[in-house]
Amino acid sequence: MPTIDAWVRFGRLLSSDSLTAGSPENPVMALPRAVGTVVEDLAYRFSSTFSRETVAGYVAQSYRLLSQRTRVREHLLTMTARYAADRLDALATAQGLVLRDTPEVLFVCVQNAGRSQMAGAFLRHFAGGRVHVRTAGSAPSDTAHPRVAAALSEVGVELWGEFPKPLTDEVVRAADYVITMGCGDSCPIFPGRRYMEWDLADPLELDDVGLRAVRDEVRSRVLDLLQELGIEAQEASR
């Protein structure tokens, strides 16, 4: 996989007149014309922070990362826009270009389809916007698992359109807490972050009873994390 610098150089090509141009690292890289709309929208959104070329490079790489894993293509452009925007937002945070007054928490598991999605959903639910939550996978699946979504829904927590995302450096650099679940060796280590490993079974390998047990354990750990952050959980009685 080309480096992000290579993709930024590719972004310069996207910023000219072609969405089918190549680069030394990707001589026949072709992107749908509609990706240009994503570039334009995000270039405007991040115009005070990043060059159009940088935005285009991140959009191109994000599209490629997702397209390699996503079987359902219907929402690929929407997912690309969300994924690229989140990565650019993380990059701005990591580089100190924006100031945050909320903790940044990153949950990482292997597929980003089970444990990390559960943890992210619970933390969003209980924190109520007082924590910035991201999730990622070291070898992400193509979709969040329906059994996980159903188990969360049983306790009043929703995934709200979340999807598996490949782990990238900038989201780790942006985090205050990096919590891994079965993939700690795959997560880059940067100074100044608190790294935690939650030893949890992969719910996708369990029956429904086992999956619910993991769900409840994740819930308990998220509530403990909120206590550590000094944030009172909302609706913790559920």
Please provide the spans of the model-predicted regions.
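A short, aliphatic-rich alpha-helical micro-motif
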Residues: 172-173
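Basic, alpha-helical nucleic-acid-binding regions used in initiation and control of genome expression
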Residues: 2-25, 34-37, 41, 50-51, ...
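Short glycine-rich anion-binding loops that position phosphate/pyrophosphate groups of nucleotides
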Residues: 113, 183-186
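Short, charged early-sequence alpha-helical segments and their helix-coil boundaries
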Residues: 63, 68-101
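Phosphate-binding/catalytic loops
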Residues: 26-28, 44, 187-238
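Conserved acidic residues
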Residues: 176
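Conserved active-site segments centered on acidic
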Residues: 90-169
